Amino acid sequence: MAVSLWQQCIGRLQDELSAQQFSMWIRPLQAEMDGDTLVLYAPNRFVLDWVRDKYINIINQFFTEQMGNDAPKLRFDIGSRPSAKKPEPAPVAAVRVPSPQTKASVGTAFNTTEPVANTNHRSNINPTYQFDNFVEGKSNQLGKAAALQVAENPGGAYNPLFLYGGTGLGKTHLLHAVGNGIIKNNPNAKVVYMHSERFVQDMVKALQNNAIEEFKRYYRSVDALFIDDIQFFANKDRSQEEFFHTFNALLEGNHQIILTSDRYPKEIDGVEDRLKSRFGWGLTVAIEPPELETRVAILMRKAQESGINLPDEVAFFIAKRLRSNVRELEGALNRVIANANFTGRPITIDFVREALRDLLALQEKLVTIDNIQKTVAEYYKIKMADMLSKRRSRSVARPRQVAMALSKELTNQSLPEIGDAFGGRDHTTVLHACRKIAQLREESHDIKEDYANLIRTLSS
């Protein structure tokens, strides 16, 4: 009875939550009765804590509405419900190669000359990319949580998993971390990672060698397929056709698919609607540019791995000025470390200013309050004058608040200076705008998307 009640509760939650919230937090839950207690099993600690913190009141309220004093007690646990646990599958043959392929490597992922019956899968997962060395922050928290769940339960609730965001934000790191997690749990798993261009190259090579059946057999018999930068399938009709059928075959067999892109699935031009629709069948998660604290943590971790003692004030100095992506941060730190090694000088703020003077000058030139105002006004299709006006209609006030929040995040200007740039507003108005936008980014998918798009535009 209570399990049936949980199914009704799921229907209520699906109506009340966004599609992403429901897929991320509610869909993975499993329910089972234990005496007079309904136990909800979460796939990991992160999901358990989130559901218990955010949704337990809604769940309990629904149970009380339906059953009054007879409502079951509620308990949370981690794992799968006992009756749902399956026997371990029989291992399947696979071949690991010691040196992982990269996006730039050449050749094909499958051997067009081998017999059809001997489809050999080379696991090209990079062992250096692990969850343990992925620096987590608010910008990538959901992405990491989803990736962890996929590593623990491939082919489960988050299938396909679609990660999107700008260049250098850690999407590829998460792909390899998932692959390493799957292989750790099942060393014989057939896990294949590749850039989308490799899939296209393999298909072309298969056509040239009259080996299209081997191509199909190879890709449709993997346990997990991870494809980076799926947007490069744009306008490649034959590749899209083959991937469409591969996608369907893998999902029907409960084999895991993870895709990445630099944009939201529906915004990928040149890709068929039927594919874009399927990209959203599982879970779609944005990976955003890292916030200040995460940027500092990334720098400190990288310095530690390099055996360098990076002073806190230096890490904050770099992190406040370089905001676009992780790759840029790490590149800047590598330059600082190299200069310090060559010159023997200690790493101070003045030293960093000198070592990164061209990079810092370019960044400060690109991101100004005026540039932010113009970019936001153009994005929301309002007049530049509206940014400075006293108008309070939501169509104007909300973009103005977004621009203020971006100014605080992307420039080194103080709150009073930002207020002055927005028509002489008080610093408390700017602070309110920043807090309001931070709240809306948690609650509104549209605002979250808008903010991420503007960050990418201003940082590119």
From Swiss-Prot:
Residues 84-123 are annotated as: Domain II. Signal peptide: none annotated. SUPFAM superfamilies: P-loop containing nucleoside triphosphate hydrolases, TrpR-like. Residues 1-84 are annotated as: Domain I, interacts with DnaA modulators. InterPro entries: AAA+_ATPase (IPR003593), Chromosome_initiator_DnaA (IPR001957), Chromosome_initiator_DnaA-like (IPR020591), Chromosome_initiator_DnaA_CS (IPR018312), DnaA_C (IPR013159), DnaA_dom (IPR013317), DnaA_N_dom (IPR024633), DnaA_N_sf (IPR038454). Residues 341-460 are annotated as: Domain IV, binds dsDNA. ATP binds at G168, G170, K171, T172. It is found in: Cytoplasm. GO terms for cellular component: cytoplasm; plasma membrane. GO terms for molecular function: ATP binding; ATP hydrolysis activity; DNA replication origin binding; lipid binding. Keywords: ATP-binding, Cytoplasm, DNA replication, DNA-binding, Lipid-binding, Nucleotide-binding. Domain I is involved in oligomerization and binding regulators, domain II is flexibile and of varying length in different bacteria, domain III forms the AAA+ region, while domain IV binds dsDNA. Plays an essential role in the initiation and regulation of chromosomal replication. ATP-DnaA binds to the origin of replication (oriC) to initiate formation of the DNA replication initiation complex once per cell cycle. Binds the DnaA box (a 9 base pair repeat at the origin) and separates the double-stranded (ds)DNA. Forms a right-handed helical filament on oriC DNA; dsDNA binds to the exterior of the filament while single-stranded (ss)DNA is stabiized in the filament's interior. Oligomerizes as a right-handed, spiral filament on DNA at oriC. This is Chromosomal replication initiator protein DnaA.
